[in-house]
């Protein structure tokens, strides 16, 4: 009996020592980082017996900033989509006016060789346009318009408005080949000596304002005999040039952040000495978990965009080049899905 017990114990020990050992779990590499930020801003002004005058106003604006970035060894692929839309209603005009409208898509692919420190060969694609028509609302030349029925008031305001923009009118799309330089975490400099793209103006009425070229079939025809509604102009323009883009992203602390993008473009094919400038700034100040102040500024200069002004309409009836500037200060609800790897 003792011998059998010893044999059984030996066999059990042998079984235990030869049993497979479980290998430790190795976490798979995660290369994607995603983030989503949504914001809704609301503004309201109400005046009662206000001696200085003014309008009762209501405004609302929505903003989405989505990012999907891939990073593996020496390769990266960054994608960003920004959507911005807002409207304003003022008691002096019985219509809703658009006060914010932007579509911006950017995708950048980069690769770094072993000998390059903080330098990447890159290909950068971007697209910019807007969702809906934008108008300049001029006061209708109708006496006592406020005494008319509301439907008639709205129609008079619509008849007096002037179209300024629309979907794909204009739109800018570019592919830039060059080098990315990232000296710090908060600064990226992209220089692309080969940048090709198109300026698209779908609406015929806006083509002259964006200096679109004459269609071939109208070349050689006297100007007085050509159409004047914009149908005589092309709906796109090809551009080839060099682009310099600077991106800054700074988180000062948990409650305050700043981002900026400057884009300079020189067109080799037409007056390369004239730079097209786009400069966007955004300041975010977090007041509470879901509420924040936001200040945005947008500066644009494009020598191909002709802007009319009542101050010098007699001297420049077709408009002239001007610096465009927009500033928005807003308070609203903000919800952010923190960047995460998946």
Predicted regions and their residues:
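Repeated loop/turn-to-beta-strand initiation elements of outer-membrane beta-barrel proteins
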Residues: 74-77, 116-120, 186-189, 255-258, ...
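Outer-membrane beta-barrel "beta-signal"
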Residues: 323-342
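Residues that define the transmembrane beta-barrel architecture of outer-membrane proteins
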Residues: 56-62, 99-105, 169-173, 236-242, ...
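Residues on the lipid-exposed face of transmembrane beta-strands in outer-membrane beta-barrel proteins
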Residues: 36, 40-42, 62-70, 105-111, ...
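Surface-exposed strand-loop-strand hairpins of Gram-negative outer-membrane beta-barrel proteins
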Residues: 43-63, 91-95
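Transmembrane beta-strands of outer-membrane beta-barrel pores
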Residues: 40-46, 72-74, 83-89, 125-135, ...
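Outer-membrane pore/translocation modules
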Residues: 98-241, 318
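Cleavable N-terminal export/targeting peptides
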Residues: 1-27, 338-342
């Amino acid at each position: 009996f003792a011998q059998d017990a010893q044999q059984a114990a030996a066999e059990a020990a042998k079984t235990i020592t030869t049993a497979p050992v479980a290998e430790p779990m190795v976490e798979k590499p995660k290369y994607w980082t995603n983030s989503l930020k949504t914001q809704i801003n609301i503004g309201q002004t109400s005046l009662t017996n206000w001696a200085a005058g003014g309008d009762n106003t209501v405004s609302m604006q929505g903003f989405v900033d989505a990012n999907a970035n891939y990073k593996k060894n020496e390769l990266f692929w960054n994608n960003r989509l920004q959507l911005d839309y807002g409207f304003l209603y003022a008691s002096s005009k019985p219509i809703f006016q658009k006060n914010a409208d932007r579509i911006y898509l950017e995708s950048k692919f980069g690769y770094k060789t072993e000998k390059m420190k903080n330098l990447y060969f890159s290909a950068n694609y971007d697209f910019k346009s807007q969702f809906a028509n934008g108008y300049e609302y001029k006061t209708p030349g109708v006496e006592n318009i406020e005494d008319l029925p509301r439907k008639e008031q709205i129609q008079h305001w619509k008849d007096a408005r002037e179209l300024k923009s629309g979907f794909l009118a204009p739109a800018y799309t570019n592919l830039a080949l060059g080098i990315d330089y990232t000296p710090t975490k908060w600064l990226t400099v992209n220089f692309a000596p080969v940048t090709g793209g198109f300026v698209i103006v779908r609406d015929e009425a806006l083509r002259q304002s964006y200096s679109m070229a004459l269609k071939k079939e109208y070349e050689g025809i006297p100007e007085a005999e050509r159409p004047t509604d914009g149908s005589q102009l092309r709906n796109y323009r090809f551009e080839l040039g060099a682009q310099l883009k600077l991106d800054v992203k700074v988180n000062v602390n948990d409650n305050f952040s700043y981002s900026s993008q400057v884009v300079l473009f020189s067109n080799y094919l037409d007056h390369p000495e004239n730079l097209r400038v786009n400069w966007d700034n955004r300041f975010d100040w977090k007041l509470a978990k879901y509420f924040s102040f936001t200040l945005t500024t947008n500066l644009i200069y494009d020598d191909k965009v002709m802007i009319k002004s009542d101050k010098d309409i007699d001297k420049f009836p077709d408009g002239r080049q001007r610096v465009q500037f927009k500033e928005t200060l807003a308070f609203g609800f903000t919800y952010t899905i923190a960047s995460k790897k998946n």
